[in-house]
Amino acid sequence: MIFETLDEFAGAVPPMRGLIGLDLGTKTIGVALSDRLLTSASALETVKRKKFGVDADALAGLIAKHEVGGIILGLPRNMDGSEGPRAQATRAFALNLSRRGDFAHLALGFWDERLSTVAAERALIAADTSRKRRSEVIDAVAASYILQGALDRLRHLRAV
């Protein structure tokens, strides 16, 4: 089920289940994974995009392997907060996932991904990562920034 706010999303995530964060690009999908306590996110891998069915199968395998309870998708808003074609494509991807049987039990939510790739790039440069290695991991690291932002918000919601 798709949730527009993290408040609603939080209530739908089963206890002791991690989350997967996705940074959808046109050629790749960056994937990050949280711990089961929903405190920290780590870059997991980058999936090369093919067709939706192949992409969804790859994600379903990761979800089953890591016993995930929900998905956070980075929503690429414009700097003024409006949604453009990339945000619409992300929403369509989420809708298509929610219609598949192997994703029906999962909570799907969105998190503003503005500047996540910039932050990931800066962190990788600061860590003295080679240009080649940066290009291999940038999407997964960006997904971890997106997921960590959502986890921090969820922790704040639980504290209130």
Swiss-Prot record:
EC number: 3.1.-.-
Pfam families assigned: RuvX
GO molecular function: nuclease activity
InterPro entries assigned: RNaseH-like_sf, YqgF, YqgF/RNaseH-like_dom, YqgF/RNaseH-like_dom_sf
Keywords attached to this entry: Cytoplasm, Hydrolase, Nuclease, Ribosome biogenesis
Cell compartments where the protein resides: Cytoplasm
Entry keyword Nuclease: yes
Domain of life: Bacteria
A cellular component annotation (GO) from this entry: cytosol
Gene Ontology biological process terms in this record: rRNA 5'-end processing
Main location: cytoplasm
Function per UniProt: Could be a nuclease involved in processing of the 5'-end of pre-16S rRNA.
Family indicated by similarity: Belongs to the YqgF nuclease family.
Protein name: Putative pre-16S rRNA nuclease
Record lineage: Bacteria, Pseudomonadati, Pseudomonadota, Alphaproteobacteria, Rhodobacterales
